[in-house]
Amino acid sequence: MSEPVPVERPVLQLRLVVEAEDYDAAVAFYRDVLGLPEQAAFEGVGDARVAILEAGRATLEIANPAQKRMIDEIEVGRPTAPGVRVAFEVTDAQAMTDRLVTAGATLVAPPVETPWRSLNARLGGPAGLQITLFQELETLDERRDKSGFGTDRERHED
């Protein structure tokens, strides 16, 4: 069993680094269309460029193969996601889906309500990213007492 997380957390930020062949198009899509504010940008030798976009609160979602297959089935109806899929919580999944598709994203599957009460859409975005847009339809507190919700630690307590 793993050690409990200390009160003072050692990790301060999760940063997902994505290589984009068409850097300008990817930055414009994620910054200007999806609306992720630019925190910083740097240039280096040999046309090296990077933009760091603020994406709000970050979490690392670890799923086993069965969960990945289930999510693909719910959101898309077939296996589709690569090993990494980027999910963005939005306030209006349908409106943001429409906005991103208009800007060039590929619609993989339109918004669908999930068993855990979120509205999820799947898109193909620049830099080869598969994107889930999700809109929460209930708060964590509203879900807490429902079957299947909680934490792994709660489910495996002796």
Predicted features, each with a name:
Residues 53-56, 123-126, 136:
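Active-site beta-strand termini and strand-to-loop segments that position acidic
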Residues 64-70, 135-138:
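Acetyl-CoA-dependent GNAT
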Residues 56-60, 66-69, 92-95:
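Short, charged/polar surface micro-motifs in flexible loops or helix N-caps
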Residues 8-10, 17-60:
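Core segments of cupin and vicinal oxygen chelate
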Residues 1-27, 84-88, 136-158:
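N-terminal beta-strand motif that seeds the catalytic metal site of vicinal oxygen chelate
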Residues 17, 37-45, 112, 134-144:
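Conserved catalytic-core motifs of GNAT/GCN5-like acyltransferases
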